[in-house]
Amino acid sequence: METPGGANYQFGLFEVNAASGELLREGKRIRLQDQPFRLLLVLLENAGRIVTREELQRRIWQENTFVEFDSSLRVAIRKLREALGDYAENPVYIETIPRRGYRFLVPAVRRSDSVDEVAEGQRAPAAAPRRAERTRSRNWIFVVLGVAFVAGAALAFRFLFHGRRELSEKDTVVLADFVNSTGDPVFDGTLRQGLAVQLEQSPFLSLISEERIQQTLRLMGQPADARLTAEVAREVCQRTASAAVLEGLIASLGSQYVLGLRANRCGTGDVLDEEQAQAARKEDVLSALSQIASKFRTRVGESLATVEKHNTPLAEATTPSLEALKAYSTALKVAQSSGDEAALPLLRRATEIDPQFAMAYAQLGTSYASVGESVLASENVSKAYQFRDRASDAERFFITASYDLQVTGNLGKAEQACEVWAQTYPRDVTPHSFLSGFIYPVFGKYEKGVEEGRKTVELDPDFAIGYSVLTYNYIYLERLEDAEGTLQRASGRRKLEIPDSLVQRYEIAFLRGDKAGMERAAALGNGESGAEDWLSDQEALALAYSGHLQEAKIMSRHAADVARQSAHGERAALYETGAALWEAFCGIEPSATRNAIAALETSKGRDEEYGVAFALALSGDSSQSQTLADDLERRFPEDTAVRFGYLPALHAVLALNHGEPAKAIELLQVAVPYERGAPPSSFFAFFGALYPVYVRGEARLAAHQAAEAAAEFQKILDHRGIVVSDPIGALAHLQLGRAFALSGDKTKAKTAYQDFLALWKDADPDIPIFKEAKKEYAKLQ
């Protein structure tokens, strides 16, 4: 049995006096039995290195201890962890290496009674060969020098290894969790997020995304929220073919803090760079982190020019508050593991701590938008835009594009912002996903949407949103095999399933007439947060599409109820607005008016107000519809969808109500470049697509322009991937029949009427438009 040496150690809030056998925390003695204490000394002596079970047995237990060794070791480890306040499942100090041994995670400061005698690894050559070997190893060991100051003794540290091998602009990097030996939980997760913000300012460096890290952890058999220790991060690095792992550390030395950063090649373990900085106070830690991040960027190959251009200090780029940054970083982690909705309270907390935290507002707005709460999204993105000067360049791109998407609605400006963003940060997936998901579809540029969606997936194969936006563009183009293949790529080996995936499966099944597939998708959504109400609304639309309005109303109410139970009032209002619209299209005017007004009392978001105004106009309430149209024009003067889709369609219906079909046709001219687009109202509530086309067709009918009317309704039938289950897709058959009847072509008219009546063969018999259709068809016989 070999007794550990007599040096003293300091780590975090703890001190160890080997000679007296004392463990102190902030000067107070902690009781620890002899065996756990000697175990601690061995681990400290080998900090950063795996100490095998065999070595522990040889050094602490009797050589002939075999039977009781395992249980004795477990007891000693447990008692030691209890003394340090450590946990096996989420270790700060002692990491269990299955079937091998243990490792002390925190770099330990080894001290002696003489300030002239320096730390382990810098002693005279007479030191044991084992120490020299440890010095040459790749372990994360800090050498601490004793330095005398007038005001007292302060400790500074440096890394043992030196070397510089540059990264290329094609390399990716994995960021490990910081080792926090201070005992202060405010640094847990916070410094990693802060470093990520600093490094993501670089157009040169590219960090592996959190989505890809989580996916890789699953393939490793680890939980998605597993701690990224140096060893785990190295395996993630190897599995993702990344170039390097960045390991960080923060330690307290008296009242000061020491930060370190080291980059290793994950394949060879070669050290690329090592940086260190000291912070005199807790409040200076973020500034110190900014310093080492900037140094690291230049030393691994980034040009000084780009570092100087894109290098906003962390306190200015995010927040000077560690507590706010802690809430923000935790929110991002929660969003990854449990969804955007679960992260909302933490993001709100971050903005409460720092009311000028621009990116916290931006993420809060994005999270609200993802759950269909556009009003709250707009409010928070507006605040982010107000404080955008307190953000890095990359974050400002995000905030500016989000502002144009969610506040002004000016998609031309959003497109320009995303294009410059993608040029400046060519490996950032977000501008491509914005273009593919929210800009090109509204313009009707679905092929461009596919192109940008593919880029998104290529840049990050584990980014679920990338597959989602690509799938939507394939559906718009009715490339259903490509859409299904994209979903399969996401859900197969990568296991990337989000609520959108179920909705997309339902839409594909609907377009194929696959009732069993629709039922499977709907069943998978039952009880799923964020999916059940959405799919219930899809089911309501499908029922309305075939004329089963009574069943559709029941399903629509269920969708709204589920949304309200989840505190999503705006989503509930959207579903109610959609129901009012299909009632209005079918001529059930009193009910449509009631439901529309009720929806507007719940929420007055842009899309709800448009849908309500449209339903009221169809139902003959021109006065109230005009009031809402004026309000839309006042509130959204720059909004692309409002200016070139919503208002032209509304004004055209109002003109028809006044018996002015020619004026209606003229008013709709401005909508022509955008009319085949998927408007924002169709993203969550599935209404509004091709409404300008439908209204123009009605105007052509009213103007007795039969051929032109038929051409408009044929556009709707030719673009089922855009309309999907909106009831105008079924009603277009009827309107086409009316156009052919007006032209005198009874044969084509009969065919069109038959197509409509086949879709509505089991429809509710008392629907006004259904009764009209049957009478009109009878006259053609």
Language-model-detected regions and their locations in the chain:
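Inter-repeat boundary and helix-capping residues of tandem alpha-helical solenoids
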Residues: 67, 318-321, 354-356, 390-395, ...
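Helix-coil-helix junctions within alpha-helical repeat/solenoid scaffolds
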Residues: 534-726, 731-759, 769-780
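Beta-propeller blade termini and top-face loops
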Residues: 505-508, 515, 520-530, 539-545, ...
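Acidic, proline/glycine-rich low-complexity intrinsically disordered segments
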Residues: 7, 17, 22-24, 28-31, ...
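Structural signal of TPR/SEL1 helical repeats
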Residues: 331, 365, 401, 436-437, ...
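The N-cap/first-turn positions of alpha helices
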Residues: 36-39, 80
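DNA-binding patch around the recognition helix
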Residues: 2-10, 31, 43-48, 64-126
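Position-specific recognition of the canonical hydrophobic site in helix A of tetratricopeptide repeat
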Residues: 335, 369, 405-406, 440-441, ...
